UniProtKB/Swiss-Prot annotation:
Species, as recorded: Leptospira borgpetersenii serovar Hardjo-bovis (strain JB197)
Family: Belongs to the bacterial ribosomal protein bL25 family. CTC subfamily.
Assembly and binders: Part of the 50S ribosomal subunit; part of the 5S rRNA/L5/L18/L25 subcomplex. Contacts the 5S rRNA. Binds to the 5S rRNA independently of L5 and L18.
Keywords: Ribonucleoprotein, Ribosomal protein, RNA-binding, rRNA-binding
MF (Gene Ontology): 5S rRNA binding; structural constituent of ribosome
An example Gene Ontology biological process: translation
Positions of region (Disordered): 1-25
Reported function: This is one of the proteins that binds to the 5S RNA in the ribosome where it forms part of the central protuberance.
Top-level taxonomic group: Bacteria
Name this polypeptide is given: Large ribosomal subunit protein bL25
PANTHER family linked: RIBOSOMAL PROTEIN L25/GLN-TRNA SYNTHETASE, ANTI-CODON-BINDING DOMAIN-CONTAINING PROTEIN (PTHR33284), RIBOSOMAL PROTEIN L25_GLN-TRNA SYNTHETASE, ANTI-CODON-BINDING DOMAIN-CONTAINING PROTEIN (PTHR33284:SF1)
Amino acid sequence: MSQSTIHKIAVKKRTETGKNENNRLRSSGMIPVNIIGAGVATSGAVNEKELAKMVHSGIRQSTLIELDVEGQGQQKVFVKEIQRFPEIDRIRHVDFYKVVPGQKIVTKIGIETTGVAKGSKTGGQFEHIIHEIRVKTIPEDLLENLTIDVTDLDVGDSIKISQLKVPASWEILINGDPIVTSVNKTKALLAAERAEAKGAAPDDAKAKKGKK
C-alpha cells in the first residue's frame, strides 16, 4: 500500500468574482479556486506555477492536499474538479472540497504493481487489467495508490478484487469479482504445448502395443 502524500499550497482569499476578475487573476499568474465545505464555497486564488507543479506531480482525487488559506489557516482538502482551457495546456479553475474526519467519501484509487511475475519468465504473458477502482472510505484510511506484489504469480494465476489487501473501512464499488492482474499462456506457449502433446501421442500408442 502507498500512504497518501500531503501536498501543500497557499491560497489567497478573494472577495471579487466573475469573468473579468478571473481573467485579471490569470494574467497576474494566479488561478481562481473554490473551497467547498458544508454547502459553503470560499473563493480564493493560488499561484499558477505552484499549482501546475502539484498537478503535474500526478495527484489524484484521493490525494490529500493541505491549503494554507489566508486568514483561516490550514485546511485539508481533496480535488473535486480541475478545469482546463481546451486549446492550451493551462489550468483554468480548480474546485477543492474540505475533508471531514470520519465522514466517508467516494473517490478513485490507482492500482500499481511491483515485482516481476514468475510466470512471465517462463513464457507467460503478464496482464494488468484494472488500473483504478472506486472506493468508499473515511479520509483517514485513504491511499494515493494501492500497490500489489505480483512476484509469485505463475502461468494461469491471477489476483481478483476480493484478494486485494485493503483497509477494513474500504468498500470497493465494483460489480462482481473481476481479475485485476493475471499471467496467461501466450500463443507460442500454447503451440509448444500442442506440439509436445502430439509428439507424446505416438510414443503412448507404441507403449500400449508393446503391452499386448
